[in-house]
Amino acid sequence: VSNEDSAAGPTGKLRTQALVHLSAFLASAGVFISLDNWALATGAGVPTLLAILAGLLAGFFMSHIFHEWGHFFGARLAGAATTIKAQPAPLFFDFDYAGSTARQTLALSAGGPLGNVLVIVLTLYSLPVVSPGRAALLAGMVGSLVFVLFLELPVTRRIRSGEAPIDAMMGHFGQGKPLFRRCTRLGVAAGAATFLTLLVL
């Protein structure tokens, strides 16, 4: 098997996606940590503002990466078939809702939010909240968690009530843009509340 054929296979595609996502994760974390350290060292307004903005963005990007890989591992641990995309992408794999069992789809669904929770726990463990930037980082992560919970949990409830996975997906996400706007507002509200609470504590 040639190197080109190996790279084009499922394992090669997964390796490529993992490296790209890891690079994006480390870049987001690195930019934030640099700006946060600058803000902590100077206490000046501009570095602090930049650290807050970087924290919010990094919280979102890092949460998204953990969320998608949580979905992936949930599906794979349940024995579901997944198709890895050839080109690097934020949503890096496809899941066959029509051909998967309810148990497999529920495992997929549970894995995503668990990934969000995991990155929050790891961040709390490794970065004490001693700056507005770090408060913003956690706020971005909490906001992302609330967004995905309101966006995805209704599908889980429909499947648990006996609806076929593909019907549950189509029925819920068929609401279109109003659904995403509503979940975005809830996520932003949760993130803002988290940020203000951490600043006061």
Could you tell me what each predicted segment is?
Residues 2-201:
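Hydrophobic transmembrane alpha-helices and their immediate loop junctions
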